[in-house]
Amino acid sequence: DNMDEGSNLTFTAQLRKRFGFGLNTSLAYTYLDAKNNLQSTEIASVLFQSQPVQGDPNNPNLGYAQFGMKQRIIASATYTHNWSETMSTNVGMFFEMGEGNQYVYSGGNRYSFTYGGDVNGDGVGGNDLIYIPSSASEINLTNSSDWAALDAFIAQDKYLSKHRGEIAERNGLLNEWFTNLDLRVLQNIGIAGQKFQVSLDILNFGNLINDGWGVRQTANPAALTPLVLDSWNDAGEPVFSF
């Protein structure tokens, strides 16, 4: 059935300034908040198996759209100096900063925390969103001594620690902010009515200066399914290993 849920909020602002001495600058900011019930880029059979769900895959909950950065800032500047009618030098800079260099603990632009195994009994493993326990009494572990490690894992993660006592959202997690700076020097040379160009491009220039800059952090795949379904107890409750 068609659904009337879902939303897409996009805000963009841009400033441009051209100076008379050959300098052009631009600064732009974009904010995106998009939610849907289905990851629309998949065919039906693949979508049923791969989309993280909170229970019934036939009635998917509203969740964050998989693609697109939540926030993005870009800035550019170019300067041109004309040495003569046939020779000029152009220096350009492109800077990008974004949140959500994109991950449902399962991959894509956003991430979701999912169980290892088929918890909801739909015949597909690895697509069930986890419940984030607040205490040891809210989860059955094969080894009860693993609670201390699981509790510490939850505490160190910004998303998990904030959503204790809840089922994780589909695509609820984002990668950390990242920055990137690219530089280009372009030399234009005119000889005998012909124009030649020689360019020097330095990608991720910040990382050339400091190896801690210009690094994009992504989720560790091993951490995307922290809980694995081991068995079911006599009460029909799932038992997990961590």
Where are these regions (language model features)?
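Short, solvent-exposed micro-motifs at the edges of structured domains
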Residues: 1-242
